[in-house]
Amino acid sequence: GTSGMWGDVGHHTVLNGPRYRGLVEDIFLKGRLSDDMSLYVHRPSVTDPTCAPEGGDTFYALSPVPHLGHGAQVPDWAEIGESYRQKVQAVLEEQLLPGLGEHLTASEMFTPETFRDRYLSPHGAGFSIEPRILQSAWFRPHNVSEEAEGLYLAGAGTHPGAGLPGVISSAEVLAQLVPD
């Protein structure tokens, strides 16, 4: 949360780092946290002003990082978490939100360990399975289990996909599939 507003920032913003393909390979293939980053920034207060106090703004910044299943090279988030958060803030201030640090009133950081421990997500993956073409949309696990009779699935790791629209759609599909 902030005590100031950035009226020129839209609801969704993507800040691509200098080497997008290399960054994606570092994160998803090598399990390495790189020196550079790309960020997705969500500003819900632009479409729903009740998300922030009057005169303030609300932002969510997502920095893709390796999940915990990559082994020894995975960062120790207890050790580097705050410095990484500061690095994200510096990128935001430089590229999108000048003066953010002076107006920051609340901040919360989620790491892969948060997703693992709080949400029981395997390897701390924030959005379930990897964002590869053969794990997207139709290729995700379907809502009716093929292995266990009577098992129905909904959520970010199932068809149709991750993100709030995908999760809600998954629940709507499931509501039609489960017998009365």
Each predicted region: which residue ranges?
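Mid-domain catalytic core of redox enzymes
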Residues: 1-53
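C-terminal structured subdomain/cap of oxidoreductase catalytic cores
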Residues: 1-6, 56, 76, 80-87, ...
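Flavin-binding catalytic cores
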Residues: 3-5, 27-36, 52-54, 75-117
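Short, histidine-centered active-site or binding-site loop motifs used for metal coordination
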Residues: 65-67, 157-158
